[in-house]
Amino acid sequence: MNTDAHTILPMIKCQDLKIHYGDHVAVDSLSFEVKRGSVYGLIGPNGAGKTTTIKAIATLIEPTYGEILVDHIPVLHQPEVARKIIGYMPDFPPVYDELRVEEFCDLFAHAYGLDRDARAKKVEECLRLTDLLDKRRALCKTLSRGMKQRALLAKTLVHEPSVLLLDEPAAN
């Protein structure tokens, strides 16, 4: 694929997305595209399916029907490939309370296949970016909810994803 065609393809494409939980319809026939390099927000009332849609794009739940492409990768058929380019931050910071902040970030950097030297460098860079460098040795359980959310953002950035999916990023 030439560079020009690559830059005009949408970074995220959801086509006729439907997600059901039993008889409950969480998402009904949602279609949209997100251009490369843009910021896109899902806005709606509680229960509208925003989090469910984000989780489907992040490969965490499987839609009942429809197609999702992330950087032209079909996430339903190649979730492991898609996960390498997606950074997902949920709405509530699930951190490992007994880990230090830098260990928490390092754990995810390791899971994404970064070697030891690259992990150390990326963890420091992400902690600096999220203003947590001075908390690097603090146990996650000692952090405020807002700081836990920043630690989660650092973890989300550590593998340099080309797509960020942030659920309620400004909640704290």
Where are these regions (language model features)?
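Hydrophobic anchor residue at the start of the ABC signature
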Residues: 153
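A short, proline-enriched helix->beta-strand linker immediately N-terminal to the Walker B motif
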Residues: 158-162
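Conserved ABC transporter NBD signature motif
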Residues: 66-77, 81-82
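Conserved ABC ATPase "signature" region
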Residues: 106, 110, 117-135
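Walker A (P-loop) phosphate-binding loop of ABC-type ATPase nucleotide-binding domains
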Residues: 45-49
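Catalytic Walker B motif of ABC-type/P-loop ATPase nucleotide-binding domains
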Residues: 164-167
